[in-house]
């Protein structure tokens, strides 16, 4: 339908505009212009066909209506000449017929509106009919209070729904003690990010179990599980709102004092104070008015305000300069005291102080231990460390 084609154009425009620097950097403006033009032409063709059908229907209705009126006038004129009815009567009939004709003509407009509404309703009904895969059980198990922060993976095997032929992790077992800091390292595609998604129960594994403080995640309310976790992604995600709302997104009850304390700990207070309206400054769509490092620091402050017993850090300092990284790392180390922390590290220099380092490859744990132990084992970690530290020193 034309509604589908218009939706496709909207999605294409949003995608290209959000990646404009990539488009320009690879000199693909011409190609994207061509794609957009083709999409517009397809939409125009569908709309033109719809308009032509609608115009034909309108023409038929007008022909029938005015044909009927003409026949009525002709027969009325005959009746007037024969004296069976008066001229006033025929005039009243013609006026009434005109009103009826107008109403019938408007039906074509209503029919067109109904078709457009049916197209939109069809798309909405598909979304409304979708059932959530992850739901709370009828009688969820209560998580321990106060929370301890223990997290365990036992023989977990997981395949993404779109890639059932290739397991993301296989027979994965990991016991994380309360207050322990565990760094997860490995090459791209090893399954590191999958661990985080399973921990927050965005997916359920096909085999094995995941427990939070001894309670299986499948038996707990997903909302309660996520309240005990603070997550900092590799790239800071902000919303089209002011700085204050972005900071307290994970804790709407945070006071002004708490907000500024978290901002100072994340080394974000300096640039926040310089914003035109301070915390009330609108940050633009997805925080486009800030640099990547500034967005990341707001994301870290947001996690600090969450004050959850478990922290998931996906290389939380990767977007910061050297000085800011040191300050934020100090703040994170203070924050991680007495909290369970899982860190996905792409730079091995950020995980040397972890209590334990887990090395993953092809969805499995191949090594684990401290930095000193793994560096002397001559395994995958030692190879990654020698390569990375050698490049950094060079």
PLM features: residue spans?
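ABC-type nucleotide-binding domain
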Residues: 144-394
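Regular, well-ordered alpha-helical segments
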Residues: 11, 18, 22-25, 45, ...
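An intracellular "coupling" helix at the cytosolic face of ABC transporter transmembrane type-1 domains
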Residues: 1-11, 15, 21-70, 113-116, ...
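The DHp (HisKA) dimerization/phosphotransfer helix of two-component histidine kinases
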Residues: 15, 22, 42, 73, ...
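Helix-loop-helix
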Residues: 49, 53-122, 127
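Short, solvent-exposed loop/turn elements at beta->coil junctions and helix N-caps
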Residues: 138-143
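Conserved catalytic Walker-motif region of ABC-type ATPase nucleotide-binding domains
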Residues: 36, 124, 153-155
């Amino acid at each position: 339908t034309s509604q589908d084609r218009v939706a496709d154009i909207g999605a294409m425009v949003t995608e290209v505009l959000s990646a404009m620097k990539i488009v320009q950097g690879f000199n693909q403006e011409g190609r994207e212009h061509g794609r957009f033009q083709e999409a517009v032409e397809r939409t125009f063709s569908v709309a033109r066909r719809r308009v032509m059908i609608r115009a034909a229907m309108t023409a038929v209705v007008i022909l029938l209506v005015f044909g009927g009126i003409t026949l009525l006038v002709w027969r009325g004129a005959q009746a007037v000449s024969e004296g069976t009815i008066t001229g006033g009567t025929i005039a009243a009939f013609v006026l009434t017929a005109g009103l009826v004709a107008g109403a019938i003509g408007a039906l074509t407009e209503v029919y067109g509106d109904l078709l457009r509404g049916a197209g939109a309703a069809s798309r909405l009904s598909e979304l409304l009919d979708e059932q959530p895969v992850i739901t709370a059980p009828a009688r969820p198990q209560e998580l321990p209070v106060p929370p301890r922060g223990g997290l365990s993976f036992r023989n977990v095997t997981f395949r993404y729904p779109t890639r059932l032929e290739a397991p993301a992790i296989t027979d994965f077992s990991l016991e994380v003690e309360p207050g322990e800091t565990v760094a997860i390292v490995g090459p791209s595609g090893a399954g590191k990010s999958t661990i985080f998604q399973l921990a927050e129960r965005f997916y359920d594994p096909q085999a094995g179990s995941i427990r939070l403080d001894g309670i299986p995640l499948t038996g707990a309310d997903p909302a309660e599980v996520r309240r005990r976790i603070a997550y900092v992604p590799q790239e800071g995600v902000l919303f089209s709102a002011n700085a204050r709302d972005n900071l307290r997104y994970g804790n709407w009850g945070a006071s002004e004092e708490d907000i500024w304390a978290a901002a100072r700990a994340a080394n974000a207070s300096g640039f926040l104070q310089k914003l035109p309206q301070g915390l009330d400054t609108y940050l633009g769509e997805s925080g486009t008015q800030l640099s990547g490092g500034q967005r990341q620091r707001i994301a870290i402050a947001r996690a600090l305000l969450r004050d959850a017993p478990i922290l998931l850090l996906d290389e939380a300092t990767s977007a910061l300069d050297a000085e800011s990284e040191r300050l934020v790392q100090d703040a994170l180390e203070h924050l991680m005291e007495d909290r369970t922390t899982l860190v996905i590290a792409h730079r091995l220099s950020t995980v040397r102080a972890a209590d334990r380092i887990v090395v993953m490859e092809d969805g499995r744990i191949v090594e684990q231990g401290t930095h000193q132990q793994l560096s002397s084992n001559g395994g995958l970690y030692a190879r990654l460390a020698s390569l990375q530290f050698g490049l950094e020193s060079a």
